[in-house]
Amino acid sequence: DRIIIGGDGSMQILKKLAKEGDMKIVAIPKTIDNDVGATESSIGFHTAVDVATQALDNLQSTAASHRRSMILEVMGRDAGHIALNAGIAGGADIILIPEIKYSIEGIITKLNSMKKHDIQHSLIIVAEAVKKENGNTVLHKYMDGEKRLGGIGDYIAHELMKKTDVECRVTSLGHVQRGAPPTASDRILASAFGVYAVDLIDKKKFDRMVAWKDRKVIDVPIDEGIRTYKNVERKDSLVETALSLDIYLGDKT
């Protein structure tokens, strides 16, 4: 009997290995992207949001003192949950996520509107999966030759400085988001998931994934956890919250 821990990609691989090895498994969702659709929350997400929020807090003072636009690039392979949540919590003026189309002109319009109110600095948070305005994916080539998501913050900065007199600085958090001490809520969630997973094994209920829904732990078929993907939806209450706070979130909101 095995407990497997990971995101949708890890679960797909481990489920296949378990089938080939004739192992009985129970899965626990752990991904900072929070994109496993069958659960409202995954282990690691709240910690990543907390790290990104602290980064925005730290960038606020230097942005104000030097009258700059500080751009923070955060993880989010396909979904913008980290950027959206941290952006609201950390007081970002602009939040860019892959689910909502943006334009450089839209960003400039927002910055100009702020200047009219004598606000000469700004905080921009962008998920790594956000594409260029022309729809091309931004990839960073590493020393091992692999190309991975990364660099959209630099692209946004370049475009803004090319078209305006705004001075930009870019910070990419990278794996700092994955290595921070877990928040209390993540520790509690992990404990609840672990206890429930062991109980499933005890009851010989296999090929199940534990999930968090309506403030309690439930279990669903592993295939459901793998198959369903959770993006930020336009009707998401946090999208409405961001818009009500006058945060720029794209041109079609």
Protein language model regions, located:
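Accessory alpha-helical/coil subdomains and C-terminal extensions
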Residues: 4-6, 16, 21, 45-166
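Short, ordered loop/turn segments at secondary-structure junctions
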Residues: 7-10, 28-34, 76, 99-102, ...
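Short, well-ordered, mixed-charge alpha-helical segments that flank or form enzyme active sites
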Residues: 11-14, 33-37, 78-82, 219
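Conserved beta-strand scaffold positions in the cores of enzyme catalytic domains, especially
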Residues: 25-27, 71, 95, 168-170, ...
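Acidic/polar active-site rim loop that often engages polyanionic ligands
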Residues: 28-41, 64-65, 89-90
